[in-house]
Design a protein with these regions (language model features):
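Short, small/polar-rich motifs associated with maturation and membrane association
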Residues: 1-269, 274-291
């Protein structure tokens, strides 16, 4: 059993990603950083004669069906349907109390053949007798644009100097480059020469190569943006010997580290119980979420 506070990672809206390295025999691979995509989780091995090897998610006794049935192998396909591949992406991490990972025969004895790949049981918070509390949790995560200085990469001038050396040694001749599947800047140059738009050895050719040498496009700035992801959660809990309840609302806003990848998620949760007698009690659990992505 895992306590949610030990699993939770700051700046991570989907708490299932925090299971990585938390339980022996459970393999968790985050194949994508995009919100809503499910991590690849293996509880009972990588293969199964029954086909699917994804574990079954159970929240407060309710089996969470996938909105889109995606196999573990297809999670890294990049298809848009993977954005709704996580069964619990709509849960507020602040509402979760614990995880219990079932790996052995107890999983199939309770949940049947669907649990052949293991079961992850999620227990949410409940009201407690004699406890009344209002709680607010806010998280702010700042992401910076990556810098080329953090990587051992050539700039445009370094790259062109390598190309020029290869050209002098005959590796980037017209016949070699023209027939290549990927030919880069020299392929574009020879295409212009072969079409008659540029003369071999002309000043125009020199200017063409010099322009490429000074280009230095910062692709990190083209693809990424500095952003602040923030989430807010308000919960109310109260209880007596007869009844108790826990209610919460939350909102998560992520402008997206990569451009055009913003996410907004809203959740609401109510867990109420009423003790009618020593032998009979009534429990109501409701949970809803809305996500725009």
């Amino acid at each position: 059993q895992l306590v949610a506070d030990d699993v939770k990672l700051s700046g991570m809206g989907d708490i299932s990603r925090g299971l990585e390295g938390r339980s022996a025999g459970v393999s968790v691979q985050n194949v994508s950083g995009t919100f809503g995509t499910a991590p690849k989780i293996r509880v009972r091995g990588a293969t199964s004669i029954y086909g699917d090897s994804k574990p079954l998610w159970v929240v407060d006794g309710v089996i969470m069906e996938d909105v889109q049935d995606i196999s573990a192998e297809d999670l890294s396909s990049g298809d848009a349907t993977t954005l709704i591949g996580s069964a619990i992406a709509g849960l507020n991490p602040e509402d979760i109390e614990s995880f219990n990972i079932l790996k052995d025969g107890s999983a199939t004895s309770i949940y049947g053949a669907r649990a052949m790949a293991g079961v992850i049981v999620v227990t949410t918070k409940k009201g407690r007798p004699g406890v009344s509390r209002v709680n607010y949790t806010g998280e702010f995560t700042y992401r910076m644009i990556p810098s080329y200085s953090n990587f051992n990469l050539m700039n445009s001038q370094d790259q062109m100097s390598v190309y020029q050396e290869m050209a002098y040694k005959g590796w980037l001749g017209n016949s070699r480059v023209t027939n290549a599947s990927a030919s880069g800047i020299y392929g574009k140059m020879y295409a212009l020469i072969n079409s008659g738009a540029m003369q071999q050895g002309s000043a125009e050719q020199v200017a063409f190569l010099q322009a490429a040498e000074r280009r230095n496009t910062d692709w990190f700035k083209e693809l990424f943006q500095p952003t602040v992801m923030h989430s807010h959660s308000v919960s109310i809990t109260s209880g007596t010997e007869k009844s108790s309840y826990y209610a919460s609302v939350s909102a998560l806003f992520d402008p997206g580290w990569t451009k055009q990848s913003e996410v907004a998620r809203y959740t609401a949760n109510l867990n109420a119980s009423y003790k009618i007698s020593d032998a009979l009690s009534f429990n109501m659990i409701t949970n809803g979420s809305y996500r725009k992505q």
